[in-house]
A protein has these predicted regions:
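Intrinsically disordered, low-complexity segments enriched in Gly and acidic/Ser/Thr residues
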Residues: 232-332
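Long, acidic/polar, low-complexity amphipathic helices and coiled-coil-like
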Residues: 82-227
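Short amphipathic beta-strand/extended segments with alternating polar/hydrophobic composition
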Residues: 130, 139-148, 180-187, 211-217, ...
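Sec-dependent N-terminal signal peptides
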Residues: 6-9
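Contiguous hydrophobic, core-forming segments of folded domains
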Residues: 31-34, 186, 206-258
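Acidic/polar, low-complexity intrinsically disordered N-terminal segments immediately downstream
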Residues: 19-136, 332-362
């Protein structure tokens, strides 16, 4: 069962926008065509990862977390440690109040390669850090800014103040080219147990050259929608649109996932390739079962999924028995033939590590 769940999650992650109407009369792909399309989609996904690894943000990140020759810590570690050493009072207040006090941190901080320290100038509008992008940079060619940060004060169950992020905006540029930008437009929270959980999120993250958007919204008292998109100008587009219906708006009333959820609907995409899936959680609960404990083909009773590309059906996704009598997740093609879904992702970890191998070096 764990292997089946892993296959589902991995496939959704890999083929996570097209929102075309798939209820068309276009003929399904033949089995051979379908296999070719699935493999092409996987190859496209790996190509997108390569573009991410070659992008400006990945290079910036690598340079900041990698130890320079003769250094015992990463470059950003050195900058951060020195900043904290020089401004202990700010960090002590942060720990004491359990709050990031934006106003207290405001200022323009400039790194000196001569003194290996930060200097500060007054700035009542924002936090600015000017520094060398790498340990070998001879100029302060990087700039980080936080020009907006707002939080919300709530009380926890012990009547203690808790400050939750509501809005924020920051960016980092190197040689005047933006490498990272985070825009948190809004977050809404609701009490859940001993803490708080987001019920609405509007977030955009730019990591050169990719833009990621995440939007969580409460459409009705018990219905939430999630939209995730990851794309670049180079043609990579991966995303997910999902909805979930809860059995109650009282988030503290649930004792299990099956009790809390009625259904989950998901459309995941990689360019024009789509996975359309739904899970009838209500029926699982009614039957007195747990999703993680579903055995073999019993999974098909509650889980439905189909693959599409360009409005044409590629395959059904079902749990079937293999030639050894073991249950596994299969793609069922138009001629009735089938292939293990795992066969398309069994080397996933190896390929990802190879693409990002510079980050995995000691």
């Amino acid at each position: 069962m764990k292997k089946i769940l892993f296959s589902i999650l991995a496939i959704a992650a890999l083929i996570s926008c097209g929102k075309d109407d798939n209820n068309s009369d276009a003929p399904a792909y033949s089995a051979e065509e379908a296999k070719t399309e699935v493999k092409a989609t996987m190859d496209n996904f790996y190509d997108c990862l390569k573009k991410a690894n070659d992008g400006g943000f990945a290079n910036f990140l690598y340079n900041t977390i990698t130890k320079a020759p003769g250094q015992n810590q990463a470059w950003f570690g050195k900058l951060a440690d020195q900043f904290e050493d020089q401004h202990q009072g700010l960090f002590t207040a942060l720990d004491d109040n359990k709050r990031f006090d934006f106003n207290s941190f405001k200022g323009t901080y400039t790194w000196s390669n001569v003194t290996n320290s930060w200097t500060k100038e007054a700035n009542t509008a924002k936090i600015v850090l000017i520094f060398p992008a790498t340990a070998t940079s001879t100029t302060n060619n990087a700039r980080a800014e936080i020009d907006n940060y707002q939080d919300e004060l709530v009380m926890n169950q012990d009547n203690e103040n808790v400050y939750l992020p509501k809005k924020a905006h920051l960016f980092i540029s190197v040689d005047n080219a933006k490498q990272l930008e985070v825009t948190l437009r809004n977050v809404e929270y609701k009490k859940l147990g001993e803490g708080f959980t987001p019920t609405a999120i509007d977030l955009a993250i730019f990591t050169n050259p990719f833009t990621t958007t995440i939007k969580l919204a409460k459409k009705e008292p018990t219905i939430y929608t999630l939209n995730f998109n990851f794309s670049s100008p180079q043609g990579c587009a991966t995303g997910l649109a999902g909805s979930i219906k809860l059995t109650s708006d009282n988030l503290d009333s649930f004792t299990s996932f099956e009790e809390a959820v009625e259904f989950i609907n998901v459309v995941a995409f990689q360019d024009k390739f789509q996975v359309i899936a739904n899970v009838d959680v209500k029926s699982v609960h009614k039957a007195g079962k747990k999703i993680a404990d579903l055995e073999g083909v019993d999974f098909n009773t509650y889980f439905k999924a189909e693959l599409y590309k360009n409005n044409r059906k590629v395959a059904d996704v079902k749990v079937e028995e293999d030639n050894r009598g073991d249950s596994d997740l299969f793609f069922i093609f138009s001629d009735g033939s089938k292939q293990r879904a795992e066969s398309y992702i069994e080397d996933f970890e190896e390929k990802v590590e190879n693409i990002f191998k510079r980050f995995f070096k000691d």
